[in-house]
Design a protein with these regions (language model features):
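Hydrophobic faces of well-ordered beta-strands that scaffold small-molecule active sites
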Residues: 16-18, 41-46, 63-67, 103
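Short, small-residue-biased leader/transition segments that mark boundaries at the very start
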Residues: 2-4
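N-terminal beta-strand motif that seeds the catalytic metal site of vicinal oxygen chelate
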Residues: 92-117, 150-157
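C-terminal helical cap(s) of enzyme catalytic domains, especially alpha/beta-barrels
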Residues: 74-96
Length: 209
């Protein structure tokens, strides 16, 4: 086992397939192997399915997962490509886990933002929290202190893996992103980014869960 990984490094590989993943100890085994090999990433296959997919992908050393649950043999033999496509799309959606995070409202100034957020918070029994550039009412409504992106405001969509979401939306669906809007943490990890387009007068941004 150690020799195989050392051999992979000697060959200049920094990504290796781990198969059969579940039968070989699953995520715990990968974490144990990853500890001494800081630059090695893994692609587990074998026993990976819709239920355990995100538990694997949550580990930063997992670059991708594979699984035959998306392409069952009986559907291949029957030529039911539409069903295979559906299963694959469902796997992608399970991975990305898109959900509404909050709605953003543009206010003219801080006073108006506080007033609007406080009123919303009062009516619906939510806490109001003043931030640097906006005021939140609970987690559902964000009122901007100055007009920002979006004619009508913005809609935030949260995702399990924002980097993977950006890659999927841009390469597969052709969605364009406003790179200047990207926000990153101290380690350089992407935390939020806006789409270039507005939808229904709303700017849209992704946010990391």
């Amino acid at each position: 086992e150690m020799c195989i990984r050392d051999r992979a490094i000697e060959l200049g590989l920094d990504v290796v397939k781990f198969f059969p993943a579940e039968q070989s100890g699953g995520l715990a085994k990968i974490k144990a192997m990853a500890a001494p090999y800081v630059n090695m990433k893994f692609m587990p296959t074998g026993g990976v399915n819709a239920k355990n997919l995100t538990s694997y992908l949550d580990f930063p050393k997992i670059i991708a997962c594979g699984g035959s649950w998306m392409v069952p043999g009986d559907l291949i033999n029957a030529g039911e490509w539409d069903k295979i496509e559906q299963l694959t799309r469902e796997a992608v959606q399970t991975m990305l886990g898109f959900e509404l995070a909050h709605v953003g409202v543009n206010a003219e100034n801080e006073e108006e933002a506080v007033k609007a957020a406080n009123r919303f918070a009062f009516i619906f029994g939510m806490p109001a929290k003043v931030g640097n550039s906006s005021v939140f009412a609970g987690s559902a409504l964000e009122v901007m202190k100055t007009p920002y992106l979006g004619k009508n405001g913005h809609i935030a969509v949260k995702t399990n893996y924002i980097e993977r979401a950006v890659n999927y939306l841009s390469t597969v669906l052709g969605v364009e992103f406003n790179e200047e809007s990207a926000k990153r943490d101290a380690k350089g990890n992407l935390k939020a980014i806006y789409l270039k387009e507005e939808i229904g007068g709303f700017a849209v941004h992704l946010v990391q869960k």
